[in-house]
A protein has these predicted regions:
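Hydrophobic alpha-helical transmembrane segments of multi-pass integral membrane proteins
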Residues: 70-73, 97-133, 326-366, 378
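Hydrophobic core segments of alpha-helical transmembrane domains in multi-pass membrane transport
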Residues: 5-17, 28-38, 71-76, 110-115, ...
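Membrane-interfacial loop-to-helix junctions in multi-pass transporters
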Residues: 1-3, 61-67, 94-109, 138-146, ...
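Short helix-coil transition sites and intra-membrane helix breaks within transmembrane domains
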Residues: 20-23, 64-67, 78-88, 115-127, ...
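Re-entrant/interfacial helical elements at transmembrane boundaries that shape
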Residues: 75, 89-91, 122-135, 164-176, ...
Length: 439
């Protein structure tokens, strides 16, 4: 009964998200439903009030506090690149040098390089967002596809590649004693397979959009911003890129905290963009950037709180145990259990943190190659991303796009294609010689 209630709750949440209902209302309604039904099924569990006030708010508040400066400073940095004309400068350079056809490949490559270089996917979003808006506007592409292009670069093949510094590739190391390049050959072949599918899909998608005559539409906010940009001198492209390079150097070479790296980038931007900023409007613009960051953070934190609540439900634990004890091949068990946890909790890293201790205990090195287990677990954590995933919520919020407008392409890139890639990886481990598969 508890599992049925959990499935109904997830269905309610997905339907409300797709209908465009505000994420907090959607999540709170679903959380209340799950808390009440779980209490009715298992009276010894926390009562609904405590479940919401302790577990849910604990997850929400913990995430809000941990990521506050990353979101706020990231939004301020993005605002500075926009109001200074730096983002427009980079966009004009790309369009001028390579033409409109290079817009999508350039953005996908930029996002992928940032993510594989170790930049948090949240920080990467704020780094490239203003540039993406400028490029989409100049190329007359619809705003609703900005999230799809971002995920194509930062949220698909890069996240599962051997050597990636993203958290999904690092968590299994802690429990399996493996390295970041574990499962090198199957991992790289799967990443190549996924890249191919992403390119094919994006090519088809943008041809279809162009054929339908769909293009950039200014809303009132962006129209006013564009009006103020006319006849404005733009910074040289090297000047425009300098603060972004500072961010990458401080984050990836000096290995400083992401919040400190963003702060350094903001200081660099204020210095090198000095002559391009309207200082009378600077404080209001920074205040607007701050509020945009807080809004995005809150929208993400509410779904993290939901994940924390779901993970305490007896039905959640029963589901995992049933999969883990099914007697299937260890790699298949890992793929199914981690994938199911991701879809239920809405978090790839959260699912890995829960699943890996149990998987490591059930499948030691004497049973299965630990590098193979690592690579399958990482792939599985990115193969069943639900519509209520925290990063998806954040990207839509920052881009000003609703689920109804943008989830179709994003769902293809973060759910359909990764599922195919997961199956491809399992086939590789089935048919490749052991000497190659375990490299």
């Amino acid at each position: 009964m508890g599992i049925i209630c959990l499935i109904i709750g997830l269905a309610i949440l997905m339907i409300m998200c797709m209908k465009g209902i505000h994420i907090f209302i959607s999540v709170f309604t679903t959380s209340l439903f799950l808390a009440v039904t779980a209490w009715l099924v298992s009276p010894d569990m926390l009562n609904p009030v405590d479940a919401l006030l302790q577990v849910y708010t604990g997850g929400l508040g913990g995430y809000f506090g941990s990521f506050f400066f990353i979101f706020v400073l990231g939004a301020i940095f993005g605002k500075l690149t926009a109001i200074s004309g730096a983002a427009d400068s980079v966009a004009s350079f790309i369009i001028g040098k390579f033409g409109e056809r290079a817009v999508i490949p350039s953005l996908v490559a930029a996002c992928a390089i940032l993510a594989y270089g170790g930049v948090s996917v949240f920080v990467a979003l704020f780094t490239v967002y203003s540039m993406m808006v400028s490029l989409f506007r100049k190329a007359n592409l619809p705003r609703r596809l900005i999230p799809a292009v971002y995920f194509a670069g930062a949220g698909t093949f890069v996240m599962i590649m051997p050597g990636s510094p993203q958290i999904q590739n690092l968590i299994p190391m802690k429990f399996l004693g493996t390295s970041a390049t574990a499962g090198l050959v199957p991992g790289m072949l799967t990443a190549l397979f996924q890249i191919t599918l992403v390119i094919i899909y994006l090519t088809w998608l943008f041809k279809r959009v162009k054929a339908k005559g769909e293009g950039w539409v200014e809303d009132e906010k962006t129209a006013k911003a564009e009006e103020g940009k006319k006849d404005r001198q733009l910074p040289n492209v090297l000047v425009a890129l300098f603060p972004m390079l500072i961010l990458l150097v401080v984050l990836n070479i000096l290995k400083w905290d992401p919040a400190i790296a963003l702060f350094c980038a903001i200081i660099a931007a204020l210095i090198v963009y000095l002559r391009y900023l309207d200082w009378k409007k600077l404080v209001p613009n920074l205040a607007a950037g701050t509020m945009e960051g807080v809004t995005s953070l809150f929208n993400t934190a509410v779904i993290v709180g939901f994940g924390a609540l779901v993970m305490t439900l007896p039905a959640f634990k029963e589901s995992f145990q049933a999969i883990a004890q099914s007697g299937l091949n260890p790699l298949v068990v890992t793929a199914i259990s981690v994938g199911a946890l991701v879809f239920i909790s809405g978090s790839g890293s959260g699912a890995l943190s829960i699943a890996m201790p149990m998987i490591a205990a059930m499948f030691p090195a004497t049973v299965v190659d630990q590098g193979s287990l690592h690579r399958v677990a990482t792939m599985a954590s990115m193969s069943t991303t639900p519509p209520f995933n925290g990063l998806i919520i954040t990207v839509f919020s920052v881009c000003g796009v609703s689920h109804k407008e943008g989830y179709g392409p994003v769902g293809t890139l973060t759910l359909a294609i990764p599922l195919l890639a997961m199956m491809f990886m399992l086939l590789l481990y089935t048919f490749l010689p052991a000497s190659i598969a375990t490299m």
